[in-house]
Amino acid sequence: METPITYFDELNPERNTLDRETIHQLRKGTKHLRAHLHLFRQLEGQQEETENLRTAVKKLARMLSVQRDADVLYSLLQNMISEADDAELVALMTELKQKLQDKRLPPSELKHVLGLTRDIKKKTHKLLGKEPAENDIKPILKLRLSELCENGEGILSSEITDWEELHDWCKQIKKLMYQHKMIRNQTPAELKIIEILDSLGDELGKINDQKILENFLQQQQLLCTRAYTHQLYQKLYSLISDYRQQHLCTCRNLLLNLMQLK
């Protein structure tokens, strides 16, 4: 069974920087662990030990979010540059990409992140010694899956206007995926549910990243004075919109597959 602690095990306490992959793994670890803690709360009510750990995990996620967003936006722009054939658009995206390179965790915060990670890892080892029974887990997951499918059908059935609602649904999808991984002896159907939830969460996450990129572009556009540069920004928004529609189409197909398994 995959556990949240695996995401923290490879972090080198002697390092003085965090690369993109390490940030990604730590963020996955915080999401996985919060999903566990949420299920514990449903089964056992609020316990001081789990609530303290939950607070620490949320704090770590917040500390990592700025660098994580910068890394993701850098990667998105890099991918768009590789696919673009407009030289002026490529030049603008390259300039924007350079502005993201400075968004790294300062040494003082990095030290705090490493200390917080060690503390979370130690407390998580204790927590994993008292996993809930699968017979208690499965009814909760079955009900939650049905609710999320129903919510998703309503959200994806028409044009998206509330992106925060879509992002919240994305977080719930990822949470449910990690909670399904708590089942030790997964059936073929449960493995398929995990696979679809994972793919759906990934597609929804890409849509949210594109919204973050749009917000970043809007901030940078405010600093522009040339009318032609504003036209280039409009081209960028159009590209992002096209990518987003592709991801939404994939999400709708994945949801249909998921609804057949609920």
Question: Which residue ranges define each predicted feature?
Answer:
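Function-determining surface determinants
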Residues: 1-262
